[in-house]
Amino acid sequence: MSVHSAGYSLVAVLKIPSKTGLFSKAKNDFDKEPKYRNYAEVTDEIWFFFDVEADDCGKWDERWKIIETLRGLREKPNVHVRLLMTTACIEYWLMLHYKMMIPTSLTTVEDKERMRHQLIEIVPNYQKGDETAIRKIAAEYPKAVERGGRVLAALLDDGLPSLDDTDERNRWLCQCGKTFTTVQEAIVFLESLRQ
């Protein structure tokens, strides 16, 4: 973990696991690694950025237990665990920087590849992790924030319990099989810290 000033506030950066198991890795790190465990009392928030895959629908209860454990790392107030999710692939969130779109499905490898190719049509040098391409895309973030909010709001008609970041809403999103993103909530939160 590195702790550094990022222009907003102090930020702790956890290593992204190279395989699936983000939630269990975080729990394990806070249980066993002194560099995380020793900072638990001063940890305000833990953010999980992840893609919701089709096979994640049945994993909510397991993840919920880990979320509850992580919240309890600090008492009064508990650690806030924020789930920042995008259906199936980050390229969907990135496409929202350029146009409003709600694909009916983003569940197959082919769906994800189509989304990636659509992004490459707009940003020809895009590759996952390419800093130059990401910076170009990020310049359009206000549009993505607005569009991501519209995508989420459209799910109210499909049964989304609330737009508020609640456990009930997050459970529904992880199990709904619909196209969505909540990444815009991180940006809205960070921008609120500036004011």
Regions found by a protein language model. Name each.
Residues 2-14, 27-47, 52-195:
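C-terminal accessory helical subdomains adjacent to catalytic cores in phosphodiester-
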Residues 16-22:
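Short, charge-patterned binding micro-sites
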